[in-house]
């Protein structure tokens, strides 16, 4: 069975979308449009889920335009964020990474070399 990335890439290939050059401004425009839909959804959870899923579709499509495999890219990114230590800060509602020299010495940096299509 194909992964979500592969299914999205196949869908984009069938419509010749991935044949286009990467378009930074076009990508940003699509993401901003979806963020607007997310904000408009207010208390409509499914509307928010739809907007977030569309953002993933656009991101995977753009990654493919750059010639990278989205699942492999995500594997590298997950390795990178998993190598960091820190704690959730309730005041900021954000996870704060430990930036001490000892913690940074253990950080993994994503390597996208083997993520090409």
Language model regions located:
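Flexible "arm" and connector segments at domain edges
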Residues: 1-52, 56-117
């Amino acid at each position: 069975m194909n992964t979500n990335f592969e299914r999205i890439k196949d869908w984009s290939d069938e419509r010749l979308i991935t044949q286009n050059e990467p378009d930074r401004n076009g990508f940003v425009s699509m993401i901003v449009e979806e963020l607007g839909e997310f904000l408009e959804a207010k208390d409509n959870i499914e509307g928010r889920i739809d907007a977030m899923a569309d953002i993933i579709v656009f991101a995977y499509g753009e990654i493919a335009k750059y010639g990278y495999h989205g699942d492999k890219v995500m594997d590298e990114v997950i390795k990178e964020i998993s190598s960091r230590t820190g704690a959730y800060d309730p005041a900021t509602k954000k996870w704060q990474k430990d930036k001490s020299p000892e913690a940074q010495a253990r950080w993994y940096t994503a390597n996208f070399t083997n993520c090409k299509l």
